[in-house]
Amino acid sequence: MAAAQGPVSCEPDTRVLGTYLSSVPIGSMGSVGSLVEKQDLSPLELRAPLGGTRGLRQPDGLLRKGPSQRELFGYLHGAKKETRSERKHQASAACYKRDYESDRENRSPERCSREHHRGADFSKSSLPERGRFDKCRIRPSAFKAVTGKGLVSMQGLSSSKGQKLSKSNGSLHTLLSQSTTAAPQHGPLRTHLLHAISLDEASDSSHNSIQSFPSYGSRLKPAQSQFSASMGHINHIGGSLDRVSRSPRDPLAPEKAPLSCKSMATLSRLQSPGEPPPPYEFTYSLEDAVKQLEDRLKETGGELRQLKRSLSETEDPFAQAFEDKQRLWLDELEDLKQMYMARLQQVTQQAQRGQRALQLQLYKAQQEKKRLQEELSMQQCQCEETKLRQSQGERVSPKLEETKWEVSPLLSLSVATLQAVQPGWGSGSLL
């Protein structure tokens, strides 16, 4: 079956499946058909024929399904006419837009519109080489049981009004796995959505059987397990989801890596009606993770070096001024030390000179003392001698007085005698 797998928000609806079971005649035999794949195109390129992109996200946080099979078939065949219901649906969904990365410039809508002016070319010359994975190729379909109705376009298989095609084969499971990782309590919701999309795919496969060729008259009733359409599946209308899932991403920020703009219309075949397809998970190699960590480490190291450099540049003037002041203070301290050492030496010399002078004076005083002591001793000796002499004179004076008194009468007698004897001699001598 050809269905675009992706996150859906609608409830599972099995009415189409019941309708298909009731409408399949017994012994009807399908026809051989083929489906030509086109090159990868972005959702913006689908906007011109489809009338705008679908809203990618619903209010409950889940992604919507991609375009319906009718719209995809109309784009592949270059259909320009749109039904009234499609216009209404396109007008209601025209408000949803999405910004894509700048590296998608080569796949911009303007450039694609200039390069692809016409619709799909299904001629033999347009078919790619065999084995080329990135280009369209024809896949034969198996013989399946289809109804015997008239010619119906291969892609004119519209799903029910409450159903929408999913975005890609693995986007639903990828987003559900991411939402389960972020919020583990939503496990039952994920299981319910997986079951709903599997039932939806089964109903789409039963309802969208290929009816583009007349049926044959075989009356063999096909088994109910063979409800998948005999149209193959389109892998590369937006098939870059596989390449995106295998491309290296940042393991630290997986939410920053948007899905490829071409994964909007990815169609893949449902392998079993009862089980969901394997999810597409984003895998990161160890080398990429190590490289990302090394890059971030280098960036952090560069920022640290820049901070150190700026800090050193900021501190350099203050450090230089402090060093200059410290050097000046050391020089002043050394000068003060030298000055006070010189003063101390000078004072010491002065003290030594004063000490020597005092010692000399003391010696002189001691010598003078000795001299004075000697003189004193001499004076004392002389005084004692004088005292002795005085004492001796005091003892001689009375004797002299006595002698005077004894001699004076004698003298007077002698004189009188002489006068008497010689009267003239005595008077002349006395005169």
Curated annotation (Swiss-Prot):
The biological processes this protein is annotated with in GO are: nervous system development
Q: Which UniProt keywords apply?
A: Cell projection, Coiled coil, Cytoplasmic vesicle, Developmental protein, Neurogenesis
Which portions of the sequence form the region Disordered?
48-127
Name the predominant localization.
cytoplasm
User: Signal sequence: where?
Assistant: none
Q: Where in the cell is it found?
A: Cytoplasmic vesicle; Cell projection, Axon; Cell projection, Dendrite
- Show the GO cellular component annotation of the record: axon; cytoplasmic vesicle; dendrite
Q: By its UniProt entry, which InterPro entries does this protein fall under?
A: N4BP3 (IPR033571)
Question: Bias regions of kind Basic and acidic residues — which residues?
Answer: 79-89, 96-127
Coiled coil located at which positions? 284-390
Function recorded in the entry: Plays a role in axon and dendrite arborization during cranial nerve development. May also be important for neural crest migration and early development of other anterior structures including eye, brain and cranial cartilage.
What is the similarity comment for this entry?
Belongs to the N4BP3 family.
Task: State the PANTHER family in the record.
Answer: NEDD4-BINDING PROTEIN 3 (PTHR32274:SF1)
| Name of the protein in its database record | NEDD4-binding protein 3 homolog
